[in-house]
Every structure is written in C-alpha cells, then in structure tokens.
Amino acid sequence: MGLFDRIKRVVSSNLNDLVNKAEDPEKMLEQAILEMQEDLVQLRQGVAQAIAAQKRSEKQYNDAQNEINKWQRNAQLALQKGDENLARQALERKKTYTDTSAALKASLDTQSTQVETLKRNLIQLESKISEAKTKKEMLKARITTAKAQEQLQGMVRGMNTSSAMSAFERMEEKVLMQESRAQALGELAGADLETQFAQLEGGSDVDDELAALKAQMLPPATPVTQAQLPPQQETTPAKSNEVVDAELDSLRKQLDQL
C-alpha cells in the first residue's frame, strides 16, 4: 500500500471502531500512533517535495512568460525596422515559449491542487495522531480504574462479612460486660462504705441505750440524814447486789441473742 493510500485510509478511519474491535485496545492504539507518526514524517517530506516542485514550476512558468513578452517586443521592433523575416522568427520563438508556458501552467495547476490536498491530509493526520494520543491516555485511565475496581471487588468477595460482623458484635458484648462489671464494683464499694458507717452509727445507738438502761435501773437518790446513816462498820446488803447482777446477766443474754 502506497503512502497516500495509507494516509487516506488513516484519515478516513474511525478510531472508536478500531478500539472496539481490537482485542487489546491500548496496544492497538499504541501501534496505530507509531504507524501514523511514521506516515506523518513521510507525508511532511512529500509535502515539502511537492511544494519545492511547485516553486520550480512557478519559476519556469514565469520565465516562459518573460520570454513570451521579450519575443513579442522583438517581433514588434523588427517590424518597425522593416525586417519582416526577423519579425517572423521572433514570433516563432514566442510561440515556442507560449506552448511551454501553457504546459507549465497546466502542470502548475495540478501541482497546486496536489499540494493543497497534501496540506489538508497533513493537518488531518496530525489531528488523528492527537486524537489517538488522547484516546490512549483516556483508555489507560479507564483500564487502571477498571483494574482497581476489579481488585477491590475481589477483596470484598474474599471477605466473610458475616464473620466480621459477628466478631464486632462479640467485641461490643465484651466491652458492655466490662462496663457493667466496673459499674457493679463501684456500687459494691460504695455500699460497703455506707455499711461501715451504718455499723458505727448503730453501735453508738446501742451504747447509748445501754447507758440509759443502766441509769434507769439505779435506785432513785434520797436525802440522807445523819440518823439514817448506817454505822461505819456496816456494808450494803448482799441481797441488793445479787438482784443487780441477775438483771445484768439477763441483759447480756438478750444482747447476745441479737
């Protein structure tokens, strides 16, 4: 396939169709870009050569026009001098350059059309290369994203979500148990302290009640006269002491039973 046929094929191609049909779109685009860049180099060389040929044809055409004008003037000059034969030769030379000029003009028109076509193809090829590079970068980004999503989905599928949730629930249950245990220990510590103070208060009440009971059991005090005082040698009757001791023993037994 010639250069111009390849360029025509590339310029008229649809990159989206090429990508969709390719087994490896990224590799296909990379190869297409390389081929288009090679074609671009050749096309630029071809455009440069065509422009150079066009310039040569333009110069030859202009030179032929100058010769036509020159021999036209020479023919007129010969006629003015009365030399008709010389004028005829000048006109024959003019005709030769006129034929050459016509051929050069036709060739120049064809070259101009070809150069314009090559320039358009060059612009389109550069645009295709830019489009291919952009699609390549977009495709690479999509491939990277797709691979990341696939990897993430694989990780999610590999995870046992129910087992993980059960583990979290067990951890939460342990934390709640520890919190409840700490709260219960705090309440017990407070209860023990209150019990100790209650025992202290209760002990004080018992002591007070015992003292009051003793005071009630003592005989009331009566005025003592000198006549009523027993002799110094006498002591308190033993019977009164026995009664008090018996009552105290009874009281102790009652307290022990509490």
From Swiss-Prot:
GO terms assigned for molecular function: lipid binding
Subcellular location: Cell inner membrane
Record membrane topology: Peripheral membrane protein
Any Pfam family matching the protein: PspA_IM30
Region annotation Disordered: where it falls in the sequence: 217-258
Ranges of compositional bias, category Basic and acidic residues: 249-258
Biased composition (Polar residues): 223-239
GO CC annotations on file: plasma membrane
Keywords of the record: Cell inner membrane, Cell membrane, Lipid-binding, Membrane
Keyword field contains Cell inner membrane: yes
Main localization, broad class: membrane
Domain observations: A helical hairpin is formed by residues 25-137 which is conserved in all known ESCRT-III proteins. Helix 5N-5C (residues 193-217) contacts the helical hairpin 3 subunits away and is essential for oligomerization. The C-terminal flexible linker and alpha-helix 6 (residues 220-256) are not required for oligomerization and do not resolve in electron microscopy.
Functional description taken from the UniProt entry: A membrane remodeling protein capable of forming rings and/or filaments on membranes, which then curve and tubulate the bilayer. Rings will form on liposomes, altering their positive curvature so the lipid bilayer is remodeled into a negative curve as the membrane enters the ring. Ring stacks of varying lengths can be seen joining isolated liposomes. A lipid monolayer can be drawn into the center of the rings. Required for thylakoid formation.
Subunit structure: Polymerizes to form rings, filaments and ribbons. Rings are formed by stacked rungs that tilt to give a dome-shaped curvature. Rings form with symmetries ranging from C11 (55 subunits) to C17 (119 subunits).
Homology family: Belongs to the PspA/Vipp/IM30 family.
Name of the protein this chain belongs to: Membrane-associated protein Vipp1
